[in-house]
């Protein structure tokens, strides 16, 4: 049971953070398919920072610097999507897909350049990111994720910025008529998405293991986070609940050999498939009732009415 809780929280927080990032982007009117790529960029930036920091540095500073660098890298990378979608009015789905493909290539090149073995694997210490409570080893991203969840809710529903962001995702022309700059708000939404997605990427890669092969990217976690966002109806606390639900399925692959599931003699690949199969089944029944922002995916033209 402790193992199930451990891995559910581990993967649930990752899915929640990335889905929250997608939520901000889509509430501004931009569909961020590039979450998978943003996770990879955030992961490689954070891991590379980890390898360069002094071994005797305070664990708090190690975590802080790594997270900030990852978030900054994600924001910079997300600017590519923002520029293509907002300024060039390019198709957001195609642009996001291209960035997903580019991210893995960039990460592999960077990893091979800095790796001692010349492979795409980077070794690092994950000890600063782990702590124990009552014999349960948890990731530092668990409390950080809870804090970011609350902040996301407050920002989205209790601030003027959040109101303006949501207005731009529902009817940007109406928002413009009352003096809200739709272009700036969409940029802000995508940048927030980049920061949270990149932190989620670092949270996915670092806590479980001490080496990562960037040729595998993040194994579809970004796409699963999109399903979590839709299932959570673009609302922070609903997204958290959906993330934990899908994380239970994801956790089965890690605990199967140490539970009664070992008697089934199933391959771990079957358990790894479960969250994706569950997402397809659930979305097939719930997508008709989804309340997506009305203007998402539609290029904003200030002159159109």
Question: Model segments located where?
Answer:
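Membrane-interfacial amphipathic/re-entrant helices at transmembrane-helix boundaries
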Residues: 1-18, 31, 45, 54-65
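Hydrophobic core segments of alpha-helical transmembrane domains in multi-pass membrane transport
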Residues: 18-19, 43-47, 104-108, 142-154, ...
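Short, non-helical or kinked segments that cap or interrupt transmembrane helices
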Residues: 24-45, 86-99, 164, 209-223, ...
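Alpha-helical transmembrane segments within multi-pass membrane transporters and channels
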Residues: 57-102, 147
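Transmembrane helix-bundle core of multi-pass membrane transporters
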Residues: 92, 103-158, 259-270, 297-305
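Helix-loop-helix "hairpin" substructures at the membrane interface of multi-pass membrane proteins
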Residues: 137-213, 236, 241
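Cytosolic-side transmembrane-helix boundaries in multi-pass membrane proteins
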Residues: 152, 170-184, 257-305
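Transmembrane alpha-helical segments in multi-pass inner-membrane proteins
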Residues: 212-276
């Amino acid at each position: 049971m402790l193992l199930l809780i451990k891995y559910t929280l581990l993967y649930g927080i990752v899915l929640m953070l990335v889905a929250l990032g997608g939520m901000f982007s889509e509430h501004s009117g931009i569909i961020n398919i590039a979450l998978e790529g943003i996770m990879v960029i955030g992961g490689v930036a954070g891991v590379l920072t980890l390898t360069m920091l002094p071994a005797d540095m305070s664990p708090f500073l190690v975590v802080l610097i790594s997270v900030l660098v990852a978030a900054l890298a994600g924001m910079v990378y997300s600017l590519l999507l923002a520029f293509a979608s907002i300024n060039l009015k390019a198709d957001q789905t195609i642009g996001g897909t291209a960035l997903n493909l580019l991210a893995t290539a960039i990460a592999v090149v960077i990893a091979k350049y800095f790796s001692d073995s010349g492979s795409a694997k980077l070794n690092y210490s994950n000890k600063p990111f782990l702590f124990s409570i009552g014999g349960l080893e948890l990731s530092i991203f668990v409390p950080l994720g809870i804090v970011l969840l609350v902040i996301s809710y407050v920002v989205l529903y209790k601030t003027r910025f959040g109101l303006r962001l949501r207005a731009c995702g529902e009817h940007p022309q109406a928002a413009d008529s009352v003096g809200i700059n739709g272009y700036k708000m969409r940029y802000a939404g995508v940048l927030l998405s980049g920061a949270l997605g990149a932190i989620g990427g670092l949270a996915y890669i670092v806590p479980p293991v001490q080496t990562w092969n960037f040729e595998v990217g993040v194994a579809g976690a970004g796409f699963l986070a999109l399903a979590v966002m839709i299932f959570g109806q673009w609302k922070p606390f609903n997204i958290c609940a959906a993330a934990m639900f899908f994380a239970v399925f994801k956790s089965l692959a890690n605990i199967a050999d140490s539970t009664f599931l070992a008697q089934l003699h199933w391959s771990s690949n079957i358990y790894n498939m479960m969250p994706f199969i569950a997402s397809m089944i659930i979305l097939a029944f719930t997508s008709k009732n989804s309340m997506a922002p009305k203007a998402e995916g539609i290029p904003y033209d200030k002159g159109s009415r």
